[in-house]
From Swiss-Prot:
EC top class, as a word: transferase
Protein name: 1,4-alpha-glucan branching enzyme GlgB
Assembly and interaction partners: Monomer.
A UniProt-annotated Pfam family: CBM_48
Pathway: Glycan biosynthesis; glycogen biosynthesis
Organism, scientific name: Chlamydia trachomatis serovar A (strain ATCC VR-571B / DSM 19440 / HAR-13)
Catalytic activities: Transfers a segment of a (1->4)-alpha-D-glucan chain to a primary hydroxy group in a similar glucan chain
Encoding gene (name): glgB
Amino acid sequence: MDPFFLNTQHVELLVSGKQSSPQDLLGIVSESLNQDRIVLFRPGAETVFVELRGKIQQAESHHSGIFSLPVMKGISPQDYRVYHQNGLLAHDPYAFPLLWGEIDSFLFHEGTHQRIYERMGAIPCEIDGVPGVRFIVWAPHAQRVSVIGDFNGWHGLVNPLHKVSDQGVWELFVPGLTAGACYKWEMVTESGQVLIKSDPYGKFFGPPPRSVSVVIDDSYEWTDSEWLEERIKKTEGPMNIYEVHVGSWRWQEGQPLNYRELADQLALYCKQMHYTHVELLPVTEHPLNESWGYQTTGYYAPTSRYGSFEDLQYFIDTMHQHGIGVILDWVPGHFPIDSFAMSGFDGTPLYEYTRNPSPLHPHWHTYTFDYAKPEVCNFLLGSVLFWIDKMHVDGIRVDAVSSMLYLDYGRYAGEWVPNRYGGRENLDAIRFLQQFNTVIHEKYPGVLTFAEESTTFPKITVSVEEGGLGFDYKWNMGWMHDTLHYFEKDFPYRPYHQSDLTFPQWYAFSERFLLPFSHDEVVHGKRSLIGKMPGDAWRQFAQLRLLLGYQICQPGKKLLFMGGEFGQGREWSPGRELDWELLDISYHQGVHLCSQELNALYVQSPQLWQADHLPSSFRWVDFSDVRNGVVAYLRFADADAKKALLCVHHFGVGYFPHYLLPILPLESCDLLMNTDDTRFGGSGKGFREPEILTPEIARQEREAAGLIEADDESGPDCWGLDIELPPSATLIFSVTLQ
C-alpha cells in the first residue's frame, strides 16, 4: 500500500496545480512513532538531494515529481536543506509553521487590521533562526495560488501557497530569499484559468512597463524624530503648500531628478520661497505616465521611476530636516483596469464595485472600489497607514472624494443603483472615509487629511463624532473656480462678475478650507495661470501678482502648483521640466520675487492663518466699488485683536492717486506689501503714505468726489483712509484699531 503522501487524490491536485493545502502533504510529516519523513515536490526533477545535518542524501523518487526521505523522529526545519536544479541549496518552505493567526484573520475580515502592511505581501523575516520571505495574499476564489519568480524559474507548481483560512488567505514562507527578489502571483481560478498578477500589497515594482513585484528591506535609518515629535504643534500654524509633480519639476541631462537628487534642491527652494509643505502628485506606483499617478496599481509602493524605496524615504527625511512637511496625493476612489493588477484579481471582481449595470467609471474608464467589503477597506486603510508609518508622510490628500460619496457620480438615470434608503449617497464609502479619518487622527495625531471634494456635501471637515467625515481640510473648489473665472474676464466685463469675488465669502467658514490653484487648472487647454490673464504682457503679469496676493490674503490655507510662482508660460506637461529659463526674463523674475515676499508675509502674519476658519477672522471694509473693481477687508488673528491686516485688491486698470476707503477708527496704518512695486515689475505706484481721515473730513472728501450729496444724511458717517491705489495690484497694510 502506498504511503499516505502518495494518495492519488492529493498527488493529482498537486500535479494539476489545484492543491490548496500543500502544507498538509509536504514538509516534515509523521510516519510512525519512531520515524518522520521529508516529503518534497519537484516537478520535472529526476533526482533530488537533501543535505541533512551536514550529510548529503538522495531522496526516494516516487512518481509525478514526489520525492521523500525517511528521517528520525524530531527532525526540525533547520536540520536539512534541499538542492534545487539551479544549484541553490535552501531550506524546505513546507517545513516551517504558518504564522497568519486567528487575530489576523478576525481583524482583516472585519476591516480593522491596522498593521496589515506588515502581514500581507512579501515580508522579509526570520522563522526559527532561518531568514527568508513570508508571502501572504488574499484570493478567496482561487483554486491555487503560487508565488513565482527568478528563484523558482517562474514555475507555478514549485511554490504553491497554503490556504490558511476558509476566507481565502494564502501563505508560504520561502527560506533564503532576500531583498531584491522579484515575484508575482500565479493563480488558478474557479474556472481553471491561469492568471499572473502583481502583488496588491507589493512594496516596490520593476520599472514600467514591467509589473514585477520586488521584495524590499525596510532598514532606512530615519533622522527626523524631532520633526515627528513637534509635528502636532505645527497643525495650527501657517500652511503654504507647494504642489509638485516629481517627474517634471526639474530635469538634469534630459532626465527627471531622482528622489535623492530632488531632495536637497526642492527642500532649499521651498525654504527660500517660504513654503511650509510640499504636496506630491501621486508617487504610488502606476503604469501610465500620462495618468500623473492618479491611476494607481501599487498602493503600498513608491514608483520606481525616480529611484528606490529607500530613496523616497531619504527624500522625505531630507524635507523634514529642512522643516518642510510632505503631503501625499492618494487615490482610494478608483483603480485601473490593467489585467496584471487588481482587476478580476482571483478570477472574480474581488476589489471592484459591481452593483451598477456597468462596473467602469464613466469619467476615467476605471473600476471603483467596493467599500462594502471589509477586506477592501482594510486594503485601503492599510495603504494610508503604511505611508504614514513607514514613509513618514505628514498629510494625505484624498483625490476625487465626490466620486466616492455619490453612487450616481458621472452617471445618468438607469446607470446606477440607489442605496438601501433609495438615495444617491454611497453609504459604504461614507463609512470608510469616517473610519479612515478616525484611525489616522487617533493613531497619528498631527497628520492632516485633505478632501478634494467639489460638491456641497455637508460636514466634510466636521468631526466623525458630530456626524461629519472628519477631514482636517477641504479643497475650496468653488472659490478656485469663481476666482479664476473672474480673472479670465477682460477688464470691461469684470464689473458684471463682481459676485465671483464676493459670493465665496458666504460659505467661506462653513468648512475648514484650503484655497488651491492646482495642477488641474493649468492643463488640457485651460492655459497656465499667466495665460489666463487678459491684456498685454505688463497687465498679465500685474494680474498674476494681484492673483497671488489675493490668494494669500483670503481666509483658508494655501496651495500653488509648481510654475505658478514665476509665471510659467506654457501649460504644464508631465513630459518635460518647468521652464526655469524664464527666470532670466525680468517679468518672471518680478513675479518670482513677489511670490517669495507674499509667502514670507503670510508665514509671519498670524492674522492670515491663526483663525482663518472662523468668521471673526474676516471683516469686510468695502466691496461696493464694482465699476473700478476694488474690494477691501480686514483680517484678524482673533476677534478681540486691535492689530489687523487691511487687504485691498484693485482688479481694474485705472490709477487713483487718492482713493478713499471707509474704515473703522484707526490709530495707525502702515504699508507692508505692494504687488505694484518696481522690484516686481510694477509701475511703482501706491507707496504714498496713507492718510487716516476723521468722519467729518472723510464726509467732505466723499462729497467732493461726488460719492454722496451734501445734504445726504442717510447712514452714519465713518472714518476714511486715503490711499494711493495702483492699477491691478494688491496692497496689504498693518493697521491698529482704536
